[in-house]
Amino acid sequence: MVSTFKYLGAIISDEGSKKEVICRIAQATAALTKLSTIWKDKEISLSTKIRLMRSLVTSIFLPVCESWTLNKDIEKRIHAFEMRCYRRILGITYRDRVTNIQVVEKVRAAAGPFVELLRVVRKRKLKWFGHVTRGTGLSKTILQGTVPGKRGRGRPRRTWTDNIRDWTGLEGDALLRRAENRKGWRKLAYVASAVPQRPIRLRDR
């Protein structure tokens, strides 16, 4: 029995989503580096650079993000990766003593409303949960099913649906009933996907 394998381009591991997220960050960072000449080109506007980054870099990171189980460590990695991308585009290093809040303000001023990458991931997960809950296929059976047998010793591992319960504040039948209402779930997903405000600091370590 193997503990890790690759399926349809995604890393499946019995240790959770960390390896897959790290791999996606590495792939997206490589794409970011290959486009360095664009980021350094002063003839290209900042708003255009930001659109290109979101189209050509974060698009590499996001596939299958709906399947990830997030924890604090993974969320910090996602946030740090996003800030690293914007700093590269802006030509700002950590030695410049510019906070992440200031980076976001510069991005917002150049490209309009700012939606955190982590919020995009959370919203996609919530949207997928609603889609599966309203369906009738195997995905719904697996999502709502239980594994027979006794649970092993120690603290239980964080599950995919733990994220949904934590973000929405709902559990059990109440969660399922809300998800079955397409319009109501869309509104809840917008609110529940919001990322708590982080303290001002230069970087996420």
Positions of PLM-derived features:
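Short linear motifs embedded in intrinsically disordered, charge-biased segments
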Residues: 1-205
